[in-house]
């Protein structure tokens, strides 16, 4: 293809309708037809990135291969497409304004008065087209965060209006995702909110090319015709998005509705192939028809909001399908774990995952959970802070290093088995300054982790400031906590495992960021397999007792 095509996805009526899933589903269908597609998210908040946002505010912060701290929607994009994203795939208002102000300070605007139009909108247009100009993609899908009519989104909507005009009708289209609510008292679907949302979009100079209508009930032909007439779109471009059992059903739903066909027609692209979703559907078949189930406890500090651990939860879905088991995740708040509660909260589980996080709140509960898993041969996976808690627990209770801790929690600890990385000691700013992105790790042969990956060297994504303190490495290894993954450049210990335990692994990196439908992460696959084996063993033991 000579020119990259652009698709813009806007939202109306309500937030949380699933623009990211619709964008990812359309991209999947286009990819399955042989097109090279990528997805970009424009976020209208003033933070430069979500790296400093509380998970309760914004869900998880997703880290890309190049070290960008981004919106969790980029996780959906990668999981659907099995293609890496980068900093260019996530733009915030804060980053836009930061760039424009820096240009003004350098004198690049030659004394002009810097304004939202044209300077901010030009910067937005430039960021939108970065991915399309490198020749890697046939189609770039850009999701506009927020809801049409929000004051924060106005510069983005104006930039899209200008760009659509500049590119021409055959090179750009707008998909508007909206809500068609069902009023149970009246027993009918109501189209008026969608009509008003489309009108608001048109007041900004944009005519939607395709309507995707989120609904709890089927849209009748009469409803579709009504929406087509009053929203000024073709009836074939009124697409139904009914509530699904799983987000992974949505690509097939959009295929059935013909979203990809309408898109190709409007972009003057050839519609001469059928999307090949065989591999996707094999995953769905295994996911929906498990042969067994396991119960895994997720020990965390932000469990009230499941989006805080979105990539972990999706990784369990991928690993469960690979093992043909259903993974039932039980959310356990680490603040509520202590000596009197731990047996009731954990004893029935088939595995324990101690989740990432920051700060001292709930730390002792995580350490107690690690100890229970270690002493009871329960499959254990510690991620980032979870690995650090495993080192602290082992140091306290096996090495008998009283008060062993991380300097993040106790700056004056006598035994800093986890310490601030040397490169972080002069850092004062919080945003974008951690050890981020993909780093090499060499694996020890004859280890659990080497068997998991089946290779000698891996590259995984990181997001942390604190590290395993190598001063305690010899003591820990002599007592049975092995260092089986080492960064070749720094000597940083990135993986630990226990010598005399069925399956006990801690990793400093975030494996959940690299699990996709097409490539479930081997660490999660192995962990779920170990949990299933533990479940079978426990059931057999109970049967023997009878």
From Swiss-Prot:
UTP binds at residues 15, 190-195, 226. Mg(2+) binds at residues 73, 143. SUPFAM superfamilies: Class I glutamine amidotransferase-like, P-loop containing nucleoside triphosphate hydrolases. ATP binds at residues 16-21, 73. CTP binds at residues 15, 150-152, 190-195, 226. Keywords: ATP-binding, Glutamine amidotransferase, Ligase, Magnesium, Metal-binding, Nucleotide-binding, Pyrimidine biosynthesis. L-glutamine binds at residues 56, 357, 385-388, 408, 465. Belongs to the CTP synthase family. Homotetramer. Catalyzes the ATP-dependent amination of UTP to CTP with either L-glutamine or ammonia as the source of nitrogen. Regulates intracellular CTP levels through interactions with the four ribonucleotide triphosphates. This is CTP synthase. The lineage of its organism: Bacteria, Pseudomonadati, Bacteroidota, Flavobacteriia, Flavobacteriales.
């Amino acid at each position: 293809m000579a020119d990259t095509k652009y698709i813009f996805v806007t939202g109306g009526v309500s937030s949380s309708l699933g623009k990211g899933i619709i964008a990812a589903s359309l991209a999947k269908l286009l990819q399955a037809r042989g097109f090279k597609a990528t997805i970009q998210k424009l976020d209208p908040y003033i933070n430069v990135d979500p790296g400093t946002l509380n998970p309760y505010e914004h869900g998880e912060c997703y880290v890309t291969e190049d070290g960008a701290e981004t919106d969790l929607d980029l996780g959906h994009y990668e999981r659907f497409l099995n293609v890496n994203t980068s900093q260019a795939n996530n733009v915030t208002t804060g980053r836009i304004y930061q760039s424009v102000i820096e240009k003004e300070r350098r004198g690049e605007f030659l004394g002009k008065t810097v304004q939202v139009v044209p300077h901010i909108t030009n910067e937005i247009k430039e960021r939108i087209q970065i991915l399309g100009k490198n020749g890697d993609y046939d189609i770039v899908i850009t999701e506009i965060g927020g809801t049409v009519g929000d004051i924060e989104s106005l510069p983005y909507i104006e930039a899209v209006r200008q760009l659509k005009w500049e590119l021409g009708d055959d090179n750009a289209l707008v998909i508007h995702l909206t809500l068609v609510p069902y009023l149970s008292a009246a027993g009918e679907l109501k189209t008026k909110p969608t009509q008003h949302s489309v009108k608001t979009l048109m007041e900004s100079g944009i005519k939607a090319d395709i309507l995707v209508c989120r609904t709890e009930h089927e849209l009748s032909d009469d409803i579709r015709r009504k929406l087509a007439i009053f929203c000024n779109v073709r009836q074939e471009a009124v697409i139904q998005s009914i509530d699904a059992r799983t987000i992974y059903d949505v690509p097939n739903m959009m295929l059935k509705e013909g979203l990809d066909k309408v898109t190709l027609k409007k972009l003057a692209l050839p519609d001469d192939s059928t999307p090949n979703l065989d591999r996707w559907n094999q995953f769905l078949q295994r996911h929906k028809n498990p042969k067994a189930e396991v119960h895994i406890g997720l020990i965390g500090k932000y469990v009230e909001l499941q989006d805080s651990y979105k990539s972990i939860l999706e990784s369990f879905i991928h690993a469960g399908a690979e093992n043909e088991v259903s993974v039932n995740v039980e959310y356990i708040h680490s603040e509520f774990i202590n000596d009197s509660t731990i047996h009731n909260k954990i004893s029935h589980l088939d595995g324990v995952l101690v989740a990432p996080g920051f700060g001292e709140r709930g730390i002792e509960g995580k350490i107690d959970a690690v100890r229970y898993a270690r002493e009871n041969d329960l499959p254990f996976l510690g991620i980032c802070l979870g690995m650090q808690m495993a080192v602290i627990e082992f140091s306290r209770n096996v090495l008998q290093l009283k008060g062993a801790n991380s300097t993040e929690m106790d700056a004056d600890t006598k035994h800093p088995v986890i310490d601030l990385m040397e490169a972080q000691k002069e850092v004062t700013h919080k945003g974008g300054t951690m050890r981020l992105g993909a780093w090499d790790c060499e694996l020890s042969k004859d280890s659990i982790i080497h068997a998991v990956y089946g290779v000698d060297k891996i590259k995984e994504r990181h997001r942390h400031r604190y590290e395993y303190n190598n001063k305690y490495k010899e003591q820990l290894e002599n007592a049975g906590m092995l260092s089986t993954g080492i960064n070749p450049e720094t000597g940083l210990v990135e993986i630990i495992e226990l010598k005399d335990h069925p399956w006990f692994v801690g990793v400093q990196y975030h494996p959940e960021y690299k699990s996709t439908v097409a490539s479930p992460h081997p660490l999660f696959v192995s962990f779920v397999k170990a949990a299933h084996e533990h479940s079978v063993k426990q059931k057999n033991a109970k049967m023997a007792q009878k």
